[in-house]
Structures are given as C-alpha cells and as structure tokens.
C-alpha cells in the first residue's frame, strides 16, 4: 500500500492549533489545489469530543467559506480527521497559511455567535447521518480554546520523517 503524505510527518512534533499545507498540486488544466491540515489538537495528547467535532463539521464548513472563498480561492471540502485532532480542507487556490489562520479564527468567532442548537445547519435526519449526535456547547468550547490559544503554522520541513525512520516503522 502506498504511503500517504499525511503519514510522512512526525505527529509527535506537531503544534496545535496550527495550519499546515499538507499537499499542493496543479491540475492538467492549470488550477492549483491545496490541502490544508487544520490541527485543532496536539496529536496523541488531546482529542476533539465526538459531538463537538460533529457540530463543528456542520458549522465550520460554511463559516470558512464565508471568510476564505473569493476570486482566487474556492473551498472544495472541509472534513474532520479520523483521529479527531483536526480537519482537512481542500481548496482551489493557494492562500497563505496566515490568510487561512485568520479565516479560521473568524470562523471560530462565528461559532460562538450561534445562539441555540437548533441553529446548527442540516440538523435533521434527512441531511445528517447522526443528527442527534451534536453539541453546540462542546463546539463553542472548542472554538473558545482555539481563539484563546491562537493559531500557529506547522511546516512540513520541520516535521518530515526521515527515510530511515519511515523504513523502521
């Protein structure tokens, strides 16, 4: 099985909250697609709550689009990581980490403005596979923690696992 890019970085050295360009590629038509690692928690030390990350999934995708989409950027998808330490965001364009971080902080401010659980988008059995597994309170606690901590940048060069280490794993 091929080694995926996300497993070639040392998770023991990742900072959180932090933005990392996980991958960048150019399509045959010349569009740049960038995948960002939006790391909310320090891997293997913290984890996002099940209900909190699910609620963030519903809120974060819309709020990030409001703050980041523009003439040169269009978000394709924002999805939670299986390890529950953050989200991957795929987009057309190549915004800087600082622009993404600013949009992320603004989106977290928006999460805090959601007044009641019933304001969570797509919170029904028709549009959500586990519509009862949500917590606005937990999502807002996550948002408060991100805002209080600020957002750093993780760089692949600083986190890259050597070929020797990868062969030994």
Swiss-Prot record:
Reactions the enzyme catalyzes: S-(5-deoxy-D-ribos-5-yl)-L-homocysteine = (S)-4,5-dihydroxypentane-2,3-dione + L-homocysteine
Disulfide topology: none
Keywords, comma-separated and alphabetical: Autoinducer synthesis, Iron, Lyase, Metal-binding, Quorum sensing
EC identifiers of the protein: 4.4.1.21
Residues at which Fe cation binds: 54, 58, 128
GO molecular function: iron ion binding; S-ribosylhomocysteine lyase activity
Class of the enzyme per the UniProt entry, highest EC level: lyase
Cofactor: Fe cation
Free-text cofactor note: Binds 1 Fe cation per subunit.
A biological process from GO: quorum sensing
Family label: Belongs to the LuxS family.
Record-linked NCBIfam families: PRK02260.1-2
Function comment: Involved in the synthesis of autoinducer 2 (AI-2) which is secreted by bacteria and is used to communicate both the cell density and the metabolic potential of the environment. The regulation of gene expression in response to changes in cell density is called quorum sensing. Catalyzes the transformation of S-ribosylhomocysteine (RHC) to homocysteine (HC) and 4,5-dihydroxy-2,3-pentadione (DPD).
Subunit structure: Homodimer.
Protein name: S-ribosylhomocysteine lyase
Species whose genome carries this gene: Shewanella halifaxensis (strain HAW-EB4)
Gene: luxS
């Amino acid at each position: 099985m091929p080694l995926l890019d996300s497993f070639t970085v040392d998770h023991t050295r990742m900072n959180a909250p932090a933005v990392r360009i996980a991958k960048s590629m150019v399509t045959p038509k010349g569009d740049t697609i960038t995948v960002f690692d939006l790391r909310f928690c320090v891997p293997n030390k913290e984890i996002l709550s099940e209900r909190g990350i699910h609620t963030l999934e519903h809120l974060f995708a819309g709020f990030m689009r409001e703050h980041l989409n523009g003439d040169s950027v269009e978000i394709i998808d924002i999805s939670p990581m299986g390890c529950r330490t953050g989200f991957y965001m795929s987009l057309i364009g190549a915004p800087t980490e600082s622009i993404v971080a600013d949009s992320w902080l603004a989106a977290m401010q928006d999460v805090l403005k959601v007044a009641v659980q019933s304001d969570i988008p797509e919170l029904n059995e028709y549009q959500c596979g586990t519509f009862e597994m949500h917590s606005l309170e937990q999502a807002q606690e996550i948002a408060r923690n991100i805002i209080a901590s600020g957002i750093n940048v993780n760089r692949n060069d600083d986190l890259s696992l050597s070929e020797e280490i990868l062969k030994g794993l």
